[in-house]
């Protein structure tokens, strides 16, 4: 059985980990970083950039750079790139493909299975969309687990011998969750969860952006929010300012040539203090307090019952957030986990539980929202209350609302409101073939079945006729099986195109290095080679220059080989004349490591990486 990776698919950054030798290890990406920006950029030449390289060029390509797509998971939102519509699942799959490739590079083997985390307060549509994203990326998602629960696994794996209750406060880039867990004897039991899927670090950035834009407009009469490139620069500057204010009392925001008018170019040079930042983001911090209060109430606990407070997510580095949690709970938050990595680490531990690598750990998670159906008068009748341990199954008998009714339409809803229309409709299905009878006589048993991923199945049975209908919830905003399959094929096609593009870049890079090194050697060789020998090599170099920028990678490789072969006699002479017996044994070494396959692929790869980092 191959390795199962654990993925924290975040709003702003993602992270991947794997179990090695019984311990979770965070995998660095191809750029050497332990987290990868969840950013996708589409280039004019059809190339797709993902991660840090995509984030770096967002200012110059704002229309074709997609950020924070996680906030739209499970909705009908589409991204339009050059007339092609992309769903949030497809964009997320591009991020997952990058993560998968980095994991495969690290492990040296193909990765096909993963555990992926989601915010605890994600509804069924959002969870299903996340699973679809994994499938499109070529991953079988064995388990969807809640982010705070994953963080608790990372925190508590080495503390399974002591019983204690923890409150996990998870404020990420785009979502907020709070979960209360009971840890003891290797059992991680979620007692309650609450949250806000529209609260995160992005909102803090937006507050700073608005403040800067308002100040600039007041001084210059220009609305920067109408200029896409200026907005992207403001976004980057706001995120940077937020991060700096976590360590400093003030920061300088300097954006030269942000725009221009008839009087000339305009610049931003603004000092933002931590006190001002706290003032403009106070309402966001306050929004996180009520979910903590509700989670405690649902768990039937008081603050005195909580033993530890765990902070998760990059946004918990904001001093005002830490202070608010401390003031509310009366406890100093634990520093026992890395807020950026612990969710991925927890996902890897869960993967280890599934493979049997991690023993004596049991995870009991809950459904975050109440599930029910719409009944007469538009009332939402609950079947499974929020914070019920999953997997679970629950049945309830209903009847018809009219005489001689032969079918019923069942509207499945998720949420805490009294009326069905105020909750999220997960899907509808019809039970037909009910025997005609006065209203209230037929007995229709509705059964809800929630699996360990939090994915819902609903069935209805007419107990009189034995007729049955069922639905696996796939809301209209999710992709159909055909759409997922199509997206999988497109993702595979892009992966193949990316591979070819990389081969071409490597071949061109190899050619340039070969040309440079051998031309340099020819200029230094003096009378150790005849003019005819030099001319023969230069002719092959000219042939290489003609083909290297074309699309035929094999022709480029052949031309490189021809240059190397033509240089071989000169290299041999050089070493013989120098009396270098060892050198004569490897005349190709005179080319300074510029050779291509089949001589020395490793050297070429190293050159390629250095150029890429520049």
UniProtKB/Swiss-Prot annotation:
Regions of compositional bias (Basic and acidic residues) in chain numbering: 598-614
UniProt keywords, alphabetically: ATP-binding, Chaperone, Nucleotide-binding, Phosphoprotein, Stress response
Pfam families: HSP70
Positions of post-translational Phosphothreonine modification: 175
The keyword Hydrolase is annotated on this UniProt entry: no
Function field: Acts as a chaperone.
Keyword Secreted: no
Molecular function via GO: ATP binding; ATP-dependent protein folding chaperone; unfolded protein binding
Disulfide bonds: none
SUPFAM superfamilies noted in UniProt: Actin-like ATPase domain, Heat shock protein 70kD (HSP70), C-terminal subdomain, Heat shock protein 70kD (HSP70), peptide-binding domain
Induction: By stress conditions e.g. heat shock.
Superkingdom of origin organism: Bacteria
Protein name as annotated: Chaperone protein DnaK
Compositionally biased residues, Low complexity: 583-597
Region of interest (Disordered), ranges: 577-614
Upper taxonomic lineage: Bacteria, Bacillati, Bacillota, Clostridia, Eubacteriales
